[in-house]
Structure formats: C-alpha cells, structure tokens
C-alpha cells in the first residue's frame, strides 16, 4: 500500500486518474467475470456458479472450475465483503489441497477472500482501481487448481539438546 500511496500523485497527474470517476466502471461482478475471462483466454478453463454448496456466508459465491476438456479441476469460493467474524485485508487460500486417495485425484477447494465495501441493498458493489487490482492479484489462488502435482509436506522438528 505504501508504494500505491507514493505513486498516486504521479498517476493522477500523468493519467488524470480520479478513483471516484473510475469506480462506476468497475462493478464487482464485471471485474470478477474479467478474472474468469482472462483465465479462460490464457488457460482455456471455465467457471460455473454452483448454487448447491454450503457457503461460509450468504454473500459468498462458489464456482466449479473446469479444464478446457471439460474435466473438473476444483472449486473456487469467493468471499468479497467484510463482517465482524472475518479478519481484514485480502488473501487467497485453500480449504483442501489437491491430493490422491485410492489412486484417484481429489480436487482442490480454494478461496479468494476480500473486504470490499458492501453496497447498499439493491446497489451494485463498485470497486476502486486498487480493489480491482487486488481481486486480480489474489485470484492467483488458481495456481492451486492448476497444479498437477501431488505434494506431501513433511515438517521436521529438530531439537537441540544443550
């Protein structure tokens, strides 16, 4: 954020950019769909909203991610708005990493979590340019979905006896 604040005056003077004038063009659903569009154009994957899965909150969304051949790659949860039980900031994570059980792939379940300002009832959520950038950045959680590797993490604890 520090760099963004330092760059803001030069961006405003160089590009005559006013965050409040950009906001109406960055409707949350359109930016989310833009992330999906870029992922489709780059990797051929598609996203379909799932309405039959439990959600961490009624405002959250779930999407099935399919490879270009139509095979299931994983599930992506997106949770955009703040609430009392949620920490601040934005991040990506994994509810379940890809694994194999009895020789069969168990697909990952990943999440993108943000704390964008929740709109008033009936109004669209409008993002700042910085928030749109955050959504694209934290959507890098897709690397977990793309992974074809099975990784076993081993934690070693060394004790030093003095």
Go through each PLM region and give its residues.
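Active-site recognition of the HExxH zinc-binding catalytic motif
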Residues: 39, 118, 123-149
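Short, exposed beta-strand "edge-strand" segments with a Pro/Gly-rich flavor and a Y/T-containing core
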Residues: 14-16, 121-125, 156
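Alpha-helix N-cap/helix-initiation motif
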Residues: 24, 28, 124-132, 158
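Acidic/histidine-rich catalytic neighborhood
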Residues: 72, 148-162
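Active-site-proximal, well-structured secondary-structure segments within enzyme catalytic domains
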Residues: 1-118, 162
């Amino acid at each position: 954020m520090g760099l963004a604040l330092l760059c803001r005056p030069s961006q405003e003077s160089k590009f005559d950019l006013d965050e409040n004038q950009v906001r109406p063009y960055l409707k949350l659903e359109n930016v989310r769909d833009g992330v999906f569009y870029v992922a489709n154009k780059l990797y051929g994957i598609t996203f379909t909203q799932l309405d039959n899965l439990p959600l961490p909150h009624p405002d959250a969304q779930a999407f099935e991610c399919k490879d270009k051949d139509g095979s299931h790659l994983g599930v992506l949860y997106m949770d955009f708005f703040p609430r009392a039980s949620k920490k601040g900031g934005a991040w990506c994570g994994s509810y379940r990493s890809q694994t194999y059980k009895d020789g069969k792939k168990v697909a990952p379940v990943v999440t993108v979590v943000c704390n964008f300002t929740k709109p008033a009832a009936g109004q669209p959520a409008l993002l700042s340019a910085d928030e749109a950038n955050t959504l694209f950045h934290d959507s890098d959680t897709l690397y977990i979905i793309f992974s074809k590797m099975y990784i076993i993490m081993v934690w070693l604890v060394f004790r030093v006896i003095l």
